[in-house]
Amino acid sequence: MLGRCKRIRIGYPGGCTIGARPVDLHLDAMKKMGVLIRETEGEICGECPEGLSGAHIHFPISSVGATENALLAGVTARGETLLENCALEPEIMHLCHFLQAMGAEIRGIGTRKIWMRRAAALRDVEYTIPTDRIVAGTCLYAAAATRGHIGLKDVDPQEMKSVLRVYEKMGGQWEMRSGTLRANAAGIRFPVEQVCTMPYPGFPTDMQSILMSVLLTVPGESRIEERIFEKRFQIVEELRKMGGRITVTGRQAVVCGGRKLTGTTVCARELRGGAALVVAGLSAQGESVVKHAEYIERGYERPDQLFGQLGAVIRIREQVEE
């Protein structure tokens, strides 16, 4: 927006209440590119009358969103831009390839250091968005929770390496055949000694609560350490309503699995936690109701149809205000 309009006025970003998500890295990057930032109550105003200028930006903390914002700004800025300590998530690489297709000159794709220079003009292109690795991982783990078989088309196992590694540790088997990842969860029965969420290529924080639902179906004691967002464990209270035995100490959760969950009414408080409650409901005895499905719909298009392809019977109905 700044590259095109030279002026913005936006509300502070919201999103899921999973922990601190400051925007200082974004604002600092824009300031280095010549943007005058003014923060008022509930709003961020920015302007660059002469347009954006290329800059050397070093992120003190690796951030997916800040890297993406700086990339988008950099391809419209005068001169050259160098980003250091960039996030390594596959989504960054895909964004770079998209911008390259539009005519931007970018080097260092897939590394911590990305260099770019503005093209004379960005052109229209047709671009196919790759498969969402977190949605694919959710489907894989949903089948794991019910010990089912699943085929996932057009997924990149390299992007899901950490998720598949945990799947294997639990006893699941998978293979790539004719462009489809085929997985068999019939052998899942082993607890996981320790899983720590980490930036890519580590185990994704977005899969943590979904894994927790799966581990409740596995006999024995498993441990999860959440190193990214401090409020990811708010799902624990809801899983306990279904009979889940989970103990939380700080950023570590101990999951005692093997006891059959019981369907009940639970409440989604954020996107991935909501998906995890659906996964728990699929493995539970009886019917489960997940309130505030709008959280889930933010990240899963038509979740009733998505999980329906796995054999689940899911209906989404409008929630009546209490």
Q: Residue spans of the language-model regions?
A:
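Structural preference for solvent-exposed beta-strand-turn elements
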Residues: 1-322
